[in-house]
């Protein structure tokens, strides 16, 4: 690796895009997303094997999001001048280690340790993903490079849950994570081969990132982001027990539902730019309102498989607008501090994922099967009301 560590120290002066490096980063992103969501489709066998409830098993998603939240806030201060190439390799190693620890976990504690390793990689990577991509291509090619990265995210979201469900039935949930560890090893070798030296900056200006929250409408926006993602994770983390017990889906049927959800999400992401051109605020208020209605429909009529499948498709199609919409809100309303605002956004989303999965799991175990749906629908409705009343939007 020394030959490429020594070269191109002036990354900012890059004149030709390094597409191999961009695709290696995109592959790493896809692997992180896939492994993050594997427990969603493997929750029941994981819980049975470890002798815990499905609600407790769902906390494997919670701990990943919780650790990722802190990693996203503090990673840039921690790594400072460290070459970003080494940092990305470390994230790929943590991804691989996480999969192996989960695969060999004989207790809930070891499972959580493995998922915490994933949280470090996930939060740290997302905090620096945009700046990393921008250093691999010339300025004119940045949008195309970012589209490759986020395209990998969309593809990973499409295949993660149905692939986990299908392979889990075929080879067992532990071997699914062993297969994911192999993907992690491929990440390591591809990054070593393709990623150039990307020297870190010794220090950043000591500006208070959280002072951004004092700007008009920003705090309301972050609260809305929190509620929308908490609502998503309160429902999606427990989609397997809800759909298998409420609608009576078997493993094969659930796999098809999850695949439909993923395809709908991919289509929603593809259409999001067209919708957001019309009105970002309308999309940010309208999407959670549709999701709130969908949660109500599933609660009342979810025992019908056709209704349950339709709700999954509508949910995937609609929620796809949410992350793209809030990123657009940041680039328009906080363009002068987009990097700092993005860091706060990542932390808020991870905190929301933590709280949504945790409270949803508690509700599932202690209140009832449809309680995660009711929690999700309530949060989505509150999000729609808050966006309508308080969130400010600058025109592009």
UniProtKB/Swiss-Prot annotation:
Keyword ATP-binding: no
Domain of life: Bacteria
Membrane side Cytoplasmic: residue ranges: 1-21, 76-85, 129-147, 197-215, 277-281, 327-343, 388-396
Record's catalysed reaction(s): inosine(in) + H(+)(out) = inosine(out) + H(+)(in); guanosine(in) + H(+)(out) = guanosine(out) + H(+)(in)
Pfam families: MFS_1
Transmembrane segments: 22-42, 55-75, 86-106, 108-128, 148-168, 176-196, 216-236, 256-276, 282-302, 306-326, 344-364, 367-387
SUPFAM superfamilies (UniProt xref): MFS general substrate transporter
Role this protein plays: Involved in the efflux of purine ribonucleosides, such as inosine and guanosine.
Protein name: Purine ribonucleoside efflux pump NepI
């Amino acid at each position: 690796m020394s030959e490429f560590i020594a070269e191109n120290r002036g990354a900012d002066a890059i004149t030709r895009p390094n597409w191999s490096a961009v695709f290696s980063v995109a592959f790493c992103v896809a692997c992180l997303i896939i492994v993050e969501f594997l427990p969603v489709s493997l929750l029941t066998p994981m819980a049975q094997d470890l002798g815990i409830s499905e609600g407790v098993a769902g906390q494997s998603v919670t701990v990943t999001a919780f650790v990722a939240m802190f990693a996203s806030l503090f990673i840039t201060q921690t790594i400072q001048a460290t070459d970003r190439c080494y940092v990305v390799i470390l994230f790929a190693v943590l991804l691989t280690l996480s999969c192996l620890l989960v695969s060999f976990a004989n207790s809930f504690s070891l499972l959580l340790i493995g998922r915490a390793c994933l949280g470090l990689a996930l939060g740290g990577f997302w905090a620096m993903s945009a700046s990393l991509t921008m250093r691999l291509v010339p300025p004119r090619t940045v949008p195309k490079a970012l589209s490759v990265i986020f395209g990998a995210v969309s593809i990973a979201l499409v295949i993660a849950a149905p692939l986990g469900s299908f392979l889990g039935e075929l080879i067992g949930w532990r071997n699914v994570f062993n297969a994911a560890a192999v993907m992690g090893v491929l990440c390591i070798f591809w990054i070593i081969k393709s990623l150039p030296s990307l020297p870190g900056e010794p220090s950043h200006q000591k500006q208070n990132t959280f002072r951004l929250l004092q700007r008009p409408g920003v705090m309301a926006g972050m609260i809305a982001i929190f509620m929308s993602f908490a609502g998503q994770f309160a429902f999606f983390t427990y989609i397997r027990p809800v759909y298998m017990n409420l609608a009576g889906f078997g493993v094969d049927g659930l796999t098809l539902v999850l695949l439909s959800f993923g395809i709908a999400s991919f289509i929603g992401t593809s259409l999001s730019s067209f919708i957001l051109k019309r009105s970002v605020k309308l999309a940010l208020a309208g999407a959670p309102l549709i999701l709130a209605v969908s949660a109500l429909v599933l609660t009342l009529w979810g025992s019908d498989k056709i209704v349950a499948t339709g709700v999954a498709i509508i949910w995937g199609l609609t929620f796809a607008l949410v992350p793209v919409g809030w990123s657009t809100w940041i680039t328009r309303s906080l363009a002068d501090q987009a990097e700092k605002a993005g860091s706060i956004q990542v932390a808020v989303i991870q905190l929301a994922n933590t709280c949504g999965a945790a409270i949803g799991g508690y509700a599932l175990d202690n209140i009832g099967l449809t309680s995660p749906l009711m929690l999700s629908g309530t949060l989505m409705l509150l999000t729609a009301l808050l966006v309508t009343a308080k969130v400010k939007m600058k025109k592009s």
